[in-house]
Amino acid sequence: MIGDVLLFLAALALAVILRLTVVEIARVKGSSMQPTLRTGQWLLVSRLDYRLGEPKRGDVVICHYPGRYMDRWKLIRQSFVKRVIGLPGETIEIIEGVVYIGGEPLSEPYLDPMRNRFRRNMPDRTLGDDEYFVLGDNRDSSNDSRRIGPIPRSMLVGRVRRVLFPFGPHPLEG
């Protein structure tokens, strides 16, 4: 009996440690990452990627909203999924819906031209040493760095590695 309780507690402790340091499961809510990700998909998120390395342009990430919480006690931060577009120190500008980094247009083959008719401009903004510019793939329906500003490195939870469910072609590869 005591052995079973200890085994259960050890398994629970291991699960908590893994979730806090290595891997997390997240669920997509909303249309901001369509067509890459869809509402209801379950994602495998690697926390380890950013413990061992730095975010790269094009990474699909889970982030915390700065200053937003899901509970009144401010214990659970609100999270969202976006794509890393701008890296620390870079200058980002949007002209007629096209993202420019350091004056050069960014190639974004993952965007759906029929869905993304967002043609507004955003004046150039240089990111700080610890800031990332994130956007949703569905620019017409995304609350992202255009609105909330750059995301500090500490707010990046991890990199989305795989869609766990539903099964099908993996939209994050290739």
Give the ranges of each region predicted by the language model.
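Mid-length scaffold segments of soluble, non-membrane domains
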Residues: 79-105
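PP2C/PPM family metal-dependent serine/threonine protein phosphatase catalytic domain
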Residues: 102-119
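Active-site loop architecture of trypsin-fold serine endopeptidases
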Residues: 142-147
